[in-house]
Amino acid sequence: MPGPVDATPPPELATAARTLFGDRLDLAVAYAGLLVTDGVIRGLIGPREAPRLWDRHLLNCAAATERIPLGATVVDVGSGAGLPGLVLAVARPDLSVVLVEPLARRTAFLVEAVEQLELGASVRVVRGRAEEVAVGGAGVEPLTGDVVTARAVAPLDRLARWCLPLVVPGGRMVALKGASAAGEAAEHAAVVQRLGGGAPEVHQCGVGVVEPPTTVIEIRRERVVATPRPASAKRSRGGRRG
C-alpha cells in the first residue's frame, strides 16, 4: 500500500500559509491531502497541478478572503473540487458557505470532503446550475448570498448573468481572475450594468503575502433585474457547468 501523502505547504510557502489559514492550517493541510489523492484519482485536479497545489490554488483562493465581510453567507458557483468555496470555509470559520456544482461526481467529492473535514455546520453542497438555484424549481431551492464567488468558470459577462441573480441587493460578486481581469472588467462593464451590477472593480488580494497577488473582479449588486426561469429548471437538473 502507498504511504501517507505529505500535503503540507512547501517551506517557502509556510509563512504565507500560516498567515492566511492561522490556527486552521492543519485543516487546510487535510483538505490538500484530499485534493492530491481523491481529487487526482477522480479527475478533479490534474496530476501536474498536485505539486503546485498550494501556490496556484489554496493560497490563491485564501487570499480572496480579504474581500469578504465578517459573518457573510457565501455562495460559490461552479465549485468543482471546492476552489474557492471550501478554501474560504477553511480559512474563515465565521462564514456560511454553499457550494453549488452541477456535476454528480464533483458534488459527491464535495459532500465527502465536507464530512471528512467536519465542516458540516458551516458548509453545505447543492447540486445544480447557477441559473437554476437562483430561481428554484426541479427540486433545486432558490439561493442567495451576501457574496457570490466563482473561479476559472467563464468570461465576466456570462459569470455576471449566472452570479448576480444570486447576490442579495447590496451584496457583491467576487470573481477570481488572472491577467485578463482589467480587460474583462472594461469589456463587459455595460453588460454588468444591464444585469443590475455596479461598475466592475479590480482588486489585488494578498499583496505582500502571496506572489503573485490574487486578482479579483468585484461587482456590487445595485438593483434587482428580473431573472427568467431557465428551461432546464422546468425539466430536470443536470447538464454542463453553469
UniProtKB/Swiss-Prot annotation:
Q: Name one GO molecular function term.
A: rRNA (guanine-N7-)-methyltransferase activity
Main localization of the protein? Answer: cytoplasm
Q: Where in the cell is the protein located?
A: Cytoplasm
Report one GO cellular component: cytosol
Task: Tell me which UniProt keywords the record has, alphabetically.
Answer: Cytoplasm, Methyltransferase, rRNA processing, S-adenosyl-L-methionine, Transferase
Classification via InterPro entries? rRNA_ssu_MeTfrase_G, SAM-dependent_MTases_sf
What EC number(s) does its UniProt record assign? 2.1.1.-
The residues listed in the UniProt record as binding S-adenosyl-L-methionine, with positions renumbered to this chain, are: 78, 83, 130-131, 151
Matching NCBIfam families, A to Z?
Answer: rsmG_gidB
Q: Which HAMAP family match?
A: 16SrRNA_methyltr_G (MF_00074)
Q: What does this protein do?
A: Specifically methylates the N7 position of guanine in position 518 of 16S rRNA.
The UniProt family comment states: Belongs to the methyltransferase superfamily. RNA methyltransferase RsmG family.
Q: What is this protein called?
A: Ribosomal RNA small subunit methyltransferase G
Gene symbol of the encoding locus: rsmG
